[in-house]
């Protein structure tokens, strides 16, 4: 058996190349013979039909043994000068079949042309509409990309990159009246005296009282340090003079009540009494000075 590759090469040479060269020689003669031209036209008609059908028939008949060799032999049979098989096959099989179905074939070809034209128009419209929509989408996309969009504020990580926040102004605390705090012994004694003596009510709005630091009961050893601490008592906070005459009697009464409470509660320790008396005297003196200055 000849290989399929070699068989295909021989079919191309002996079935197409050599007959084409013989047809060329016949056409280029000074006086071409009509019979020779007719013969080669019939040959090429049969070869064209074989080429069309072998594309489909090879898938079903190529498994037959010696199929490629038989096809090569048939091509040689058609043009070989001694056999001249083209004339026999054309006149016996091909021409009678075509003459019988020529009208049907022409009608089918006309319908096929009409349908092909309609299908071409329909597909052209679809392609045009699709291309138009796609072009519009592309133009819209390009226009959207060209217009600048407002960029959202980027969140910067880390505390170092954050802008320093403006310090909020703290609300100014309102001055509240501060109560005079004394030692435990003096407070207890003053509470007892308050139970016995009626309290005096002062009309008008309450005013802030002067702050007096508490003087705890100190040991005799630490008497020197307590005296130094008592001398550094802060001066009373003086607000704008608004009805000072009502505030001053209250301050004097409180100081006198504290002095009386200090005198009523005898303390066996001498240094403590002297410290309290000195504190009361200093406070009275300062109150009198402030009162005289405000009255001026």
UniProtKB/Swiss-Prot annotation:
Q: Where is the composition biased (Polar residues)?
A: 223-233
* Classification via InterPro entries: TB2_DP1_HVA22
User: Where along the chain is composition biased (Low complexity)?
Assistant: 180-193
Q: What residue spans carry the Acidic residues bias annotation?
A: 251-261
Q: Where is the composition biased (Basic and acidic residues)?
A: 270-281
In Pfam terms, one family for this protein is TB2_DP1_HVA22
Q: Which domain of life is it from?
A: Eukaryota
Q: Where is this region: Disordered?
A: 146-296
What family is this protein classified in? Belongs to the DP1 family.
Spell out the PANTHER family in the cross-references: HVA22-LIKE PROTEINS, LP05237P-RELATED
Protein name, per record = HVA22-like protein i
Q: What species was this sequence derived from?
A: Arabidopsis thaliana
Species lineage, top-down? Answer: Eukaryota, Viridiplantae, Streptophyta, Embryophyta, Tracheophyta
């Amino acid at each position: 058996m000849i290989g399929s590759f070699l068989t295909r090469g021989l079919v191309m040479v002996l079935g197409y190349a050599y007959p084409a060269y013989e047809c060329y020689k016949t056409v280029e003669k000074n006086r071409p013979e009509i019979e020779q031209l007719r013969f080669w036209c019939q040959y090429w008609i049969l070869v064209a039909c074989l080429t069309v059908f072998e594309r489909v028939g090879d898938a079903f008949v190529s498994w037959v043994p010696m199929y490629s060799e038989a096809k090569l032999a048939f091509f040689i049979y058609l043009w070989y000068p001694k056999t001249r098989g083209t004339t026999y096959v054309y006149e016996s099989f091909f021409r009678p079949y075509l003459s019988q179905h020529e009208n049907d074939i022409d009608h089918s070809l006309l319908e096929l042309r009409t349908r092909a034209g309609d299908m071409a128009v329909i597909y052209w419209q679809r392609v045009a509409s699709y291309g138009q929509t796609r072009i519009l989408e592309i133009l819209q996309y390009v226009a959207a990309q060209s217009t600048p969009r407002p960029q959202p504020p980027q969140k910067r990580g880390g505390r170092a990159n954050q802008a320093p926040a403006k310090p909020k102004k703290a609300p100014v605390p309102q001055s509240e009246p501060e109560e005079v705090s004394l030692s435990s012994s003096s407070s207890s004694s003053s509470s007892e005296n308050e139970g016995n003596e009626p309290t005096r009510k002062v009309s008008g709005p309450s005013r802030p009282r002067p702050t007096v630091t508490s003087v705890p009961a100190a040991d005799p050893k630490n008497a020197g340090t307590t005296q130094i601490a008592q001398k550094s008592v802060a001066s009373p906070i003086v607000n704008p003079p608004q009805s000072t005459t009502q505030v001053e009697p209250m301050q004097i009464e409180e100081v006198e009540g504290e002095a009386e409470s200090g005198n009523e509660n005898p303390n066996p320790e001498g240094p403590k009494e002297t410290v309290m008396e000195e504190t009361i005297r200093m406070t009275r003196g300062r109150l009198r000075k402030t009162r005289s200055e405000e009255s001026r």
